[in-house]
């Protein structure tokens, strides 16, 4: 991550062991069920080649069909049950850490802010997705 770039951090504690959290975070059949910031959005398709140099794409769309985009990038670091670093298509960096704490897993994401939307909006959106992830893991 670049020192001059604004870094946003979001995190949650999931009431599940790290191996379950890792699977639900990385397998496309789970990603499509939690990867949305609000109930009026969804991810109808996800692809994930989880290895350094591997690519991922999640198709994110408004349920009413009014807007959609591909959230995609390339993995830089993959340390099973510990860390995932990737570079987005616009060259921003993202770092994700998984830390098991007494049967729970602390999941922390740090990402470089983009220039278009306010920092608060970006943080709120990414946190909402992480909150959906927590709920999905804990109820499945």
Sequence positions of predicted segments:
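Hydrophobic ligand-binding cavity/cleft-lining segments
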Residues: 1-41
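Short, surface-exposed coil-to-beta transition loops
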Residues: 7-9, 68-72, 91-95
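Generic structural detector for well-ordered beta-strands
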Residues: 9-15, 49, 59, 74, ...
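A short, structured loop/turn motif at beta-sheet edges
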Residues: 18-19, 50-51, 76-81, 97-106
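Hydrophobic pocket/interface hotspot
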Residues: 21-22, 31, 56-58, 75, ...
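Glycine-rich portal/gate segments that line the openings of hydrophobic small-molecule binding cavities
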Residues: 42-85
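Beta-strand/loop substructures that line and gate deep hydrophobic ligand-binding cavities in soluble
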Residues: 83-128, 133
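Short, highly charged C-terminal tails/helix-capping segments
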Residues: 136-140
């Amino acid at each position: 991550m670049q020192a001059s770039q604004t870094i946003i951090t979001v995190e949650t504690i999931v009431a599940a062991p790290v191996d379950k959290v890792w699977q639900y975070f990385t397998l496309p059949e789970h990603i499509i069920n939690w990867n949305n910031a609000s109930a009026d959005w969804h991810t109808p398709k996800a692809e994930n080649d989880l290895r350094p140099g591997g690519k991922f794409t999640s198709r994110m769309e408004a349920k009413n069909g009014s807007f959609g985009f591909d959230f995609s990038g390339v993995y830089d670091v993959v340390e099973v049950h510990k860390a995932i670093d990737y570079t987005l298509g616009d060259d921003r960096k993202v770092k994700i850490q998984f830390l098991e704490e007494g049967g729970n897993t602390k999941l922390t994401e740090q990402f470089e802010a983009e220039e278009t939307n306010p920092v608060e909006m970006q943080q709120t959106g990414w946190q909402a997705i992480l909150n959906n992830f927590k709920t999905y893991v804990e109820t499945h």
